[in-house]
Amino acid sequence: MITSQQMRAARALLGIDQRELAALAGVSLPTIQRMEASDGQVRGVVDTLMKVIAALEGAGIELIGENAQSTGTGRGIRLRTAVSD
């Protein structure tokens, strides 16, 4: 669904802190802190995950799955595996 790295990157792009994301999503600050502290895929109550994703998307973030194409317009960034020499 969403990784902790995506959450942190999305917040950075929006220029908001964890408290602001919690308010946008209607969840508690400790919930956001736990989600971002997890390793890899965020696990938790599906309803809570959906609230966070909806808040990020509502603020203009496009979450792109692995090997998926972006449907949005404009410039963006994607993290990929480093190419070996």
Task: Label each region the model flagged.
Residues 46-63:
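DNA major-groove recognition helix of helix-turn-helix/homeodomain DNA-binding modules
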